[in-house]
Amino acid sequence: GLSIEQIERIEGNIDFPSLAPLIKIARVLGVRLGTFLDDQSELGPVICRKKDSNDTNSIGFSNNDSKARKHMEYHSLSQDKSGRHMEPFLIDVAPSEDGVDFVLSTHEGEEFIYVLEGVLEINYGKNTYILEEGDSIYYDSIVAHHVHAAADNTAKILGVIYTPY
């Protein structure tokens, strides 16, 4: 769950919750995750063109901890699609910091990640996986996990998050 302090920081626009708490908040409120991420609705197909993308469509998430750094910048590829159950993102992953303990997250749903650039390290349960450019992983997000760039590298990934409604 979320602490009262975390909820107050979110309500006060001091912190933007990480993905796991955001999914939990959506479930408690009975709304889909996309409700928090979009402000328009399109019933038909949604096309996202590179020439129209900008940084105002991005969200920086920390991972479950209000004190954690925001190591991932999410660029939504579907923010105008109403009623969606999948959340596709292009994600810029900042280099890992030495000595940082990663806070594992867990939430309902599934995630698919495809590495476009760089090297990614994924802690999943008790296992660690290294993914390089062209590699992918599909996993149940109810298992504790953390996604970060390996060593001092940056990475760019395509991530698709499915959350049941």
Which residues does each predicted region cover?
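Recognition helix of helix-turn-helix/homeodomain-like DNA-binding domains
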Residues: 2-18
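DNA major-groove recognition helix of helix-turn-helix/homeodomain DNA-binding modules
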Residues: 20-35, 41
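Solvent-exposed, charged amphipathic helical/linker segments at domain boundaries
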Residues: 38-65
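A short glycine-rich, His/Asp/Glu-containing loop-to-beta-strand
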Residues: 56-102, 160, 164-165
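Ligand-binding loop in jelly-roll beta-barrel domains
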Residues: 70-73, 132-133, 141-165
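Short acidic-glycine-tyrosine-enriched beta hairpin
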Residues: 77, 125-141
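Short, conserved beta-strand element in jelly-roll/cupin
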Residues: 90-94, 105-122
